[in-house]
């Protein structure tokens, strides 16, 4: 990839996480569970939200889309409001991308590790919706 393409990709990811952070700042503390997800996901089965009652984050297993070894993804995660707000990739972003582009699942892992956020992975088998179904 050219340096320009790499810079643009990193910039777009930073914009994404800035948008997520700003939207989560709008949520009040009245909710037991806050969900952050892509709006174009399709789920084969019902999401087991009743299993998401702990104090950590519940991350969607990304290996279904990205391949083995990439269990952490940014497509879907949920947890108590406090934990969802704590999960802020912007806190590690600049150092993480200092040497160039890396895969998003590594950013998720680094954020969880650096911020010491308890978490588990949910096997939701979700996939992005066929664009022709979106109106």
Where are the regions a protein language model picked out?
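ER/Golgi luminal nucleotide-sugar-dependent glycosyltransferases, focusing on the catalytic module
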Residues: 1-135
């Amino acid at each position: 990839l050219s340096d320009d393409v790499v810079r643009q990709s990193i910039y777009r990811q930073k914009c994404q996480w800035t948008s997520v952070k700003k939207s989560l700042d709008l949520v009040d503390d009245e909710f037991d569970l806050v969900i952050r997800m892509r709006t174009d996901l399709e789920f084969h089965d019902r999401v087991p939200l009743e299993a998401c009652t702990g104090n950590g984050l519940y991350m969607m297993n990304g290996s279904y889309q990205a391949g083995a070894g990439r269990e952490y993804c940014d497509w879907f995660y949920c947890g108590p409001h406090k934990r969802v707000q704590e999960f802020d990739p912007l806190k590690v972003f600049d150092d993480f991308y200092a040497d160039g582009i890396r895969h998003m699942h590594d950013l998720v892992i680094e954020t969880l590790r650096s911020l010491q956020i308890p978490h588990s992975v949910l096997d939701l088998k979700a996939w992005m919706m066929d664009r022709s179904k979106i109106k």
